[in-house]
């Protein structure tokens, strides 16, 4: 049954770029459309999206519709089948494009590649966290109903939502789906806008109909129910176009795999606001005999009025012509193979003239003569906003960037700025064309046009500004640097040269200052033992929250290729999304940079295996290269199966381990604490999320390094018990019981960015407080105590209040 839509005539509204292609955000732009009554998102909800929305002080709860632009394909990367290209492309053109694609693929795998090519994960990789945050802040309506939210996009959105059921919920959000296919893409109309999807498709050759890969399992995981998945659409019966997404029979309603040759969709949009009614001509109405106010009202509402003399006055006689609404196009054309399909689509011809056109394109597409000719065909008064997939060196999270720059003054090695982070190019090319940046606006209405007044400035000048405005901080920094430089180098010990990089140090959801959980462990190895002498590390990720890949890219720049190629193990402590929602992005990068022969170990709860298997049915994952081991296989109170033992043996050999144990954490089901011990003598223990645990203290005994969550300050002990987390003092007490010498506290509550009230100057226990991007060797943790005064000054509440607009000068 159709519902009545009451149109709102709104002349003034604007769109704003939340993110563009960068090291830590999706290569598909995220565009926020603002009306008084509600907000919309077009483009992507990629990793880092909700943090960028928060950083720009936009209201997540006001967003009611998201329109995605990129479809999925289960084929391997870069295997486009040119036979599905436009019929107007000649055979020679196809061959040339195929060759060009080969060059592009080669460039993608080069160390200095700066161009991203969209995948399904780029489109919606941040949606799990987005949905959880939206659910937390949404409130029921007046009659108790859940807050409405519609996700528009390719039909595989259904499968994607179903695969997320192991770790997402939305009891406060009535989530519905509007799926598009190449044959059917209905127009969306609400009180503010009319949205027409423009869908084109391209077939990828899927390894020439590759078979569905199997993950190398080290568990007794229950297989997916293929019979139910393939015989009918019952697997998504709990996701429909007119009902909320409800989890039912979670272990069995599994996504049906996409057909091997299912076309990949590229969706553009025509967006138009509703026309403004013409003005009521009171003088003309009076001349026609209309004298009563009620009659004027009826005419204004479009109703005819019959006078006492029998004459009928019609609205068109007293109301001027309506003013057409404003229109804009969002073009998604990330591949040269679909240029003709996009630009020759009949819907552009039939659409109203746009005020502006947004181009989500690769550099190759933008420079293509055919595409340039199409841009030139628009009237000269039309503005063009170019959102290239080329990596932009922009600041997406200003307060975090300011904190990192300030910490960098204290110690540039422990708190590196990151590679190429802070270059900001000119936004506007000319009056007609502008390159999109975060916070760039385009206004419609009285002040139609580009507004770049809010676009952030370069942060390179920030260090001098900080030192000038915070003279006390400068003196604290100089004092700390003197202590560190005067201290003799600590003697080496087993594991002293292991490097720890705390990529994400906050809890629950991203914040202005901290991203969610991820700790990167870089273990040096003997180059002589390696086939590739350039790779001198074997790396581990301890948890992998949303945005982990982005932080790695910021941290290591063009060396990201080597870091990812050296990644051998991902450990997931439990199934909360803030600890694992970044794994798919890392796997995508690992596929791109690994040699194709390497194995990647993943130890995680069994539900995580289901997530990977089901997600791989809608998007490519390198499952044949993954060795999965359930965390429960390592429990001290049980013996692993023969298959688990075989997988564990390979893991032990890879890292030269003599011990790897887990114990149940005092947190959610299937959550674990762990320790690993190397044959050389070093030992690392990691708590994950937990209340203080005697069992963990026991397996962490005499560890070289203990990494422990410290979510809440000591005054919030009751909340810590309720939420099953640890306070600062409780975490340190576990470290003391374990007899460890070095401890890193992390996973701080996002409620407050201030520094924990902890004495870090102790000699017997070396304490480091984790910050995003902090990098230090285990042997350097003992120097962290000299940073106490400058850190306390930097993160006191008064200084934080002063940073209301940290990038403004």
Swiss-Prot record:
It comes from the Eukaryota. This is Ribonuclease Z 1. Pfam families: Lactamase_B_4. One of its GO terms (molecular function) is metal ion binding. Belongs to the RNase Z family. SUPFAM superfamilies: Metallo-hydrolase/oxidoreductase. Gene3D superfamilies: Ribonuclease Z/Hydroxyacylglutathione hydrolase-like. Keywords: Cytoplasm, Endonuclease, Hydrolase, Metal-binding, Nuclease, Nucleus, tRNA processing, Zinc. The gene is trz1.
């Amino acid at each position: 049954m159709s519902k009545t839509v009451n149109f709102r005539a709104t002349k003034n509204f604007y769109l704003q770029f939340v993110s563009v292609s960068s090291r830590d955000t999706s290569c598909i732009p995220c565009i926020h459309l603002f009306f008084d009554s509600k907000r919309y998102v077009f483009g992507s909800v990629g990793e880092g999206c909700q943090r960028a929305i928060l950083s720009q002080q936009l209201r997540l709860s006001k967003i009611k519709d998201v329109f995605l632009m990129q479809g999925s394909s289960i084929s391997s990367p870069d295997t486009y089948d040119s036979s599905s290209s436009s019929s107007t492309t000649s055979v020679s053109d196809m061959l040339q494009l195929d060759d060009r694609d080969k060059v592009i693929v080669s460039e993608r795998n080069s160390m200095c590649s700066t161009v991203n090519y969209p995948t399904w994960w780029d489109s919606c990789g941040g949606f799990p966290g987005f949905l959880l945050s939206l659910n937390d802040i949404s409130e029921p309506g007046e009659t108790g109903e859940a807050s409405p939210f519609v996700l528009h996009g390719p039909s595989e959105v259904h499968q994607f939502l179903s695969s997320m059921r192991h770790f997402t919920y939305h009891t406060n959000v009535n989530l519905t789906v509007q799926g598009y296919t190449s044959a059917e893409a209905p127009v969306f109309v609400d009180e503010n806008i009319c949205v027409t999807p423009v869908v084109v498709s391209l077939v990828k050759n899927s390894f020439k109909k590759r078979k569905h890969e199997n993950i190398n399992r080290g568990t007794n995981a229950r297989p997916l129910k293929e019979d139910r998945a393939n015989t009918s659409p019952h697997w998504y019966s709990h996701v429909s176009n007119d009902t909320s997404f409800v989890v039912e029979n979670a272990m069995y309603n599994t996504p049906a795999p996409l057909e091997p040759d299912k076309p990949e969709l590229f969706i553009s949009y025509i967006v138009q606001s509703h026309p403004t009614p013409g003005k009521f001509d009171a003088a003309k109405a009076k001349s026609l005999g209309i004298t009563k106010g009620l009659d004027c009202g009826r005419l204004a509402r479009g109703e005819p009025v019959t006078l006492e003399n029998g004459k009928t006055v019609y609205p068109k006689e007293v109301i001027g012509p309506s003013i057409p609404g404003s229109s804009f196009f969002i073009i998604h054309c990330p591949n040269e193979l679909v240029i003709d399909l996009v630009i020759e689509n009949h819907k552009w011809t039939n659409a109203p003239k746009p005020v502006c056109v947004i181009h989500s394109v690769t550099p190759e597409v933008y420079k293509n003569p055919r595409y340039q000719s199409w841009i030139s065909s628009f009237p000269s008064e039309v503005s063009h906003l170019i959102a290239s997939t080329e990596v932009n060196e922009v600041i997406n999270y200003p307060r975090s960037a300011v904190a990192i720059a300030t910490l960098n003054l204290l110690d540039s090695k422990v708190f590196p700025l990151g590679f190429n982070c802070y270059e900001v190019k000119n936004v506007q090319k000319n009056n007609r064309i502008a390159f999109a940046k975060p916070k760039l606006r385009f206004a419609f209405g009285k002040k139609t046009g580009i507004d770049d007044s809010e676009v952030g400035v370069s942060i390179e000048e920030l260090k001098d500004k900080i030192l000038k405005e915070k003279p006390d901080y400068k003196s604290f920094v100089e004092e700390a640097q003197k202590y560190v430089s005067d201290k003799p180098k600590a003697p080496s010990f087993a594991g002293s040269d292991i490097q720890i990089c705390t990529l994400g140090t906050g809890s629950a959801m991203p914040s202005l200052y901290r991203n969610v959980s991820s700790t990167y462990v870089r273990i040096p190895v003997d180059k002589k033992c390696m086939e590739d002498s350039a790779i001198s590390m074997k790396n581990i990720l301890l948890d992998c929250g949303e945005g982990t890949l982005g932080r790695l890219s910021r941290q290591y720049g063009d060396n990201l290729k080597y870091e990812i190629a050296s990644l051998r193990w991902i450990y997931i402590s439990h199934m909360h999304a803030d600890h694992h929602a970044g794994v798919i992005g890392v796997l995508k990068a690992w596929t791109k940079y690994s040699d194709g022969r390497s194995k990647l170990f993943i130890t995680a709860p069994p539900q995580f295996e289901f997530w990977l298997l089901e997600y791989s049915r809608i998007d490519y994952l390198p499952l044949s290269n993954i060795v999965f081991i359930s965390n429960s296989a390592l429990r001290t109170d049980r013996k692993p199966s023969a298959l688990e033992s075989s997988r564990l043996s390979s893991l032990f050999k890879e890292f030269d381990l003599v011990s790897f144990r887990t114990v149940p954490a005092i947190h959610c089901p299937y959550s674990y604490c762990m320790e690993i011990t190397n044959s050389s003598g070093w030992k690392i223990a990691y708590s994950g999320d937990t209340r203080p645990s005697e069992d963990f203290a026991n397996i962490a005994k005499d560890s070289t390094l203990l990494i422990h969550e410290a979510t809440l300050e000591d005054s919030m002990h009751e909340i810590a018990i309720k939420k099953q987390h640890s306070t600062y003092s409780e975490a340190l007490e576990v470290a003391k019981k374990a007899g460890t010498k070095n401890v890193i506290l992390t996973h701080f509550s996002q409620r407050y960015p201030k520094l924990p009230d902890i004495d870090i100057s102790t000699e017997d226990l070396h304490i480091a407080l984790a910050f995003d991007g902090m990098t230090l060797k285990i042997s350097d943790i003992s120097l962290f105590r000299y940073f106490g005064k400058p850190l306390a000054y930097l993160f006191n509440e008064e200084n934080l209040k002063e940073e209301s607009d940290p990038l403004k000068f």
